[in-house]
UniProtKB/Swiss-Prot annotation:
Cell division is among the record's keywords: no
Subunit and partners: Monomer.
Protein name: Phosphoglycerate kinase
Main location: cytoplasm
Pathway: Carbohydrate degradation; glycolysis; pyruvate from D-glyceraldehyde 3-phosphate: step 2/5
Originating species: Corynebacterium efficiens (strain DSM 44549 / YS-314 / AJ 12310 / JCM 11189 / NBRC 100395)
The entry's keywords: ATP-binding, Cytoplasm, Glycolysis, Kinase, Nucleotide-binding, Transferase
Enzyme Commission number(s) of this protein: 2.7.2.3
Length: 405
């Protein structure tokens, strides 16, 4: 990755300089606005600690949720400021706005080693504007917070696939560097994209075939096996002629799945049994059947135990594994066995077969934590679901491309 990194910035010296860091604190919150998964916050700490220890005046920005360009208390970064303070062991102030009077006053008042968190950048409609002039004006205002001799560090890997102001446009206005998280994520994904050790297995789950179509097309030539579970597997099974009853289905993608099976059928590995629910509810009645015994009027919420076994056999022989998307509705304990079983098979392959295993962010990373699995059992857990998929599809990531300038 031919870009300047945090090491380059630290070598230049940051003592007394304002450094704006774009992190990704788009974390899940419960109804009491408590953070339920601190993974992305923990991942941001190495860059922030390195800067504060070197005497920088650090200004951090992030989005949270989709407030649609309006101030909305529900999406305030207050819980993030609190969590950062706890994790860093130092007070992290939260500005009352993004580029308003409070943000400027607090930025001007920073001393060496201080951290200021701006309020949710998506409270300003210009953050996600399609109008380059609007984004440019917002970028000017953000850059102004850094005063003279400021710098920008891109460390929110989960957003580098978006050409948004705080990710892309601001990098045109300040000396720019890749933070440790972004640098590490890119190097891991480059290893998989450019030189994966065979056998290379891709595990795809999640709800929609349409979301993963690009990655199937891109990886079919490189991967030895593509395991498909989760909501997207039902469209493939339907394309094979199986009855999936009321399971999630993308009717408009059935012909596409038929085409993929015709072209890559020797690589695509599908479930051989399914776990069914009488309704979409965590306490629904549950049945496991083979593919030809679908219970009338039910819907499948997970793969079955024979499928886990089949997938585990493939994974156990693999040397490179990329996993993106759960195998079922893991949030419901009764329908979490498929995701747990496949995740454990990846952990086992990593330990016993020396596999290089990457969890591609998003719901997969969340499931590892929710199910209490050993995070250290994987070679790498990415913080970016969409970004990691787009990288492996060979797409240019705007937030990375702009750093190469």
């Amino acid at each position: 990755m031919a870009v300047k990194t945090l090491k380059d910035l630290l070598d230049e010296g940051v003592d007394g300089r304002h450094v704006i860091v774009r992190s990704d604190f788009n974390v899940p919150l419960n109804d009491d606005r408590e953070i339920t998964d601190k993974g992305r916050i923990i991942a941001s700490l190495p860059t922030l600690k390195a800067l504060t220890e070197a005497g920088a005046k650090v200004i951090v920005m992030s989005h949270l949720g989709r407030p649609k360009g309006e101030v909305n208390e529900k999406y305030s970064l207050a819980p993030v400021a609190e969590a950062l303070s706890d994790e860093l062991g130092q007070y992290v102030a939260l500005a009352a706005d993004v580029v308003g009077e409070d943000a400027h006053e607090r930025a001007n008042g920073l001393t060496e080693g201080d951290i200021l968190l701006l309020e949710n950048v998506r409270f300003d409609p210009r953050e996600t504007s399609k109008d380059e002039a609007e984004r440019g004006a917002f970028a000017d205002e953000l850059a102004a917070l850094a005063a003279d001799n400021g710098a920008f560090v891109s460390d929110g890997f989960g957003v580098v696939h978006r050409a948004q102001t705080s990710v892309y446009d601001i990098a045109k206005r300040l000396p720019h560097y890749a933070g440790r998280l972004v640098e590490n994520e890119i190097s891991v994904l480059e290893k998989i994209a450019e030189n994966p050790e065979a056998p290379y297995t891709v595990v795809l789950g999640g709800s929609k075939v349409s979301d993963k179509l690009g990655v199937i097309e891109a990886l079919a030539s490189k991967a030895d096996s593509i395991i498909i579970g989760g909501g997207m597997c039902y469209t493939f099974l339907k394309a094979q002629g199986h009855d999936v009853q009321k399971s999630m289905l993308q009717d408009e993608m059935i012909d596409t799945c038929k085409d993929l099976l015709e072209r890559f059928g020797d690589k695509i590995v599908l479930p051989v049994d399914l776990t069914w629910a009488s309704e979409f509810a965590k306490d629904a009645e549950k049945k496991v059947t083979d593919l030809d015994s679908a219970p009338e009027g039910w819907l499948s919420l997970d793969i079955g135990p024979k499928s886990v076994e089949k997938f585990a056999d493939v994974l156990g022989a693999s040397k490179t594994i990329f996993w993106n998307g759960p195998m079922g509705v893991f949030e419901f304990e009764a329908f979490s066995d498929g995701t747990r079983g496949v995740a454990q098979a990846i952990i086992d392959a990593t330990a016993n077969n020396g596999a290089f295993s990457v969890v591609g962010g998003g719901d997969s990373a969340a499931s590892v934590r929710v199910l209490g699995l050993d995070e250290e059992g994987f070679s790498h857990i990415s913080t970016g679901g969409g970004a990691s998929l787009e990288f492996l599809e060979g797409k240019e990531l705007p937030g990375v491309a702009i750093l190469k300038d």
